[in-house]
Amino acid sequence: MPKICILGSGSWGTAQALLLSSKEFQVILWGRIEDGVDSLQQDRENRRFLPGIRLSDTIVATSDLARALKGADIVVMAVPSQSLREVLEKARPYLGKDSCLVNTAKGLEISSGMRMSQVVEDVLGKQSRERYAVLSGPSHAEEVARNIPTAITVASYHKENAFLVQDLYMTPFFRVYTNPDVAGVELGGALKNIIALGTGIASGLGYGDNTQAALLTRGLHEIIRMGEAMGGEARTFSGLSGIGDLVVTCSSRHSRNRQAGILIGQGYSLEETLKQIAMVVEGAHTIRVVHRLACQLRIDMPICTACYNVLYANRKARDEVDDLMRRQKKHEIEEIVKRKKGW
């Protein structure tokens, strides 16, 4: 029976603890704030992030990193993307050399522009690549914790790791597919948050379903362009970790990025919005990296650029939407036009 350590006691870390403990695995849930972890351990409930859901008695919650990682066969990283490096550096002395590393964070590191697998390799060394996997897809913690049917993707450089994680997580309510495209799966999870901010902004401005559908669809084109430039496979973005996660993040009431966008569209500043959400909004960080990379690589990302301008360049959201609608006319899918000779 494997021992599983989950780093991160937020909503997603807690939901994964519930899922894995339902299979009678030994699960330790680590959180950095001692008072919060003590409350989890004593009350058997994550009142801040998943109120009303009882934790299994077999889940052990602790703020002691050494205790959490001791003897762990599987280490699940469920901390915010901007915290991953710091947590890994603290965890490194206690990590087993053969532990499988499962990342569930969705973002890009602001300072380096790295994907999460690259951050892991940078901190733990190249050998960590051999045991790394990323789990991503449309999986709001609020639904996973309540056993609402969910499907998701695991990617790894080595199929044995992917199969291991697939078997680990599969339940009658949680289906896991495998994919060898680590970069694509990571990028789909990171980039969709920007588009969700955009659809939220449109909703906050009072625009309807047509506008949001257009932003989602054209946003997918931007995700594919940037994703391919950063090493992902185009087909991956048509899967669960791509369009699947994009759809749920752009449309769900559980989506922090969409909710943040709505508030910004209603006129709140980014600072006011983040304070009101009171949880990590990954898209607000990822957009800074993507805007920088788009400029460096000269990749056309009009929706992402518009969102960046609203969040960080003091532009009015309605003006950015107007500018998007007035862009130079073009074909919808250039690749099809190129194949149609004489069109």
Curated annotation (Swiss-Prot):
Pathway: Membrane lipid metabolism; glycerophospholipid metabolism. The active site is at K192 (proton acceptor). The keyword Lipid metabolism applies. Sn-glycerol 3-phosphate binds at K106, G137, S139, K192, D245, S255, R256, N257. GO terms for biological process: carbohydrate metabolic process; glycerol-3-phosphate biosynthetic process; glycerol-3-phosphate catabolic process; glycerophospholipid metabolic process; phospholipid biosynthetic process. It is an enzyme of class 1 (oxidoreductase). Keywords: Cytoplasm, Lipid biosynthesis, Lipid metabolism, NAD, NADP, Nucleotide-binding, Oxidoreductase, Phospholipid biosynthesis, Phospholipid metabolism. It catalyses: sn-glycerol 3-phosphate + NAD(+) = dihydroxyacetone phosphate + NADH + H(+); sn-glycerol 3-phosphate + NADP(+) = dihydroxyacetone phosphate + NADPH + H(+). The keyword Manganese does not apply. NADPH binds at S11, W12, R32, K106, A141, R256, V280, E282. Pfam families: NAD_Gly3P_dh_C, NAD_Gly3P_dh_N. InterPro entries: 6-PGluconate_DH-like_C_sf, 6PGD_dom2, G3P_DH_NAD-dep, G3P_DH_NAD-dep_C, G3P_DH_NAD-dep_N, NAD(P)-bd_dom_sf. Gene3D superfamilies: N-(1-d-carboxylethyl)-l-norvaline Dehydrogenase, domain 2, NAD(P)-binding Rossmann-like Domain. One of its GO terms (molecular function) is NAD binding. It is found in: Cytoplasm. SUPFAM superfamilies: 6-phosphogluconate dehydrogenase C-terminal domain-like (SSF48179), NAD(P)-binding Rossmann-fold domains (SSF51735). GO terms for cellular component: cytosol. It comes from the Bacteria. Its EC number is 1.1.1.94. Belongs to the NAD-dependent glycerol-3-phosphate dehydrogenase family. PANTHER family: GLYCEROL-3-PHOSPHATE DEHYDROGENASE, GLYCEROL-3-PHOSPHATE DEHYDROGENASE [NAD(+)] 2, CHLOROPLASTIC. HAMAP family: NAD_Glyc3P_dehydrog (MF_00394). Catalyzes the reduction of the glycolytic intermediate dihydroxyacetone phosphate (DHAP) to sn-glycerol 3-phosphate (G3P), the key precursor for phospholipid synthesis. This is Glycerol-3-phosphate dehydrogenase [NAD(P)+]. The lineage of its organism: Bacteria, Bacillati, Bacillota, Clostridia, Eubacteriales. The gene is gpsA.
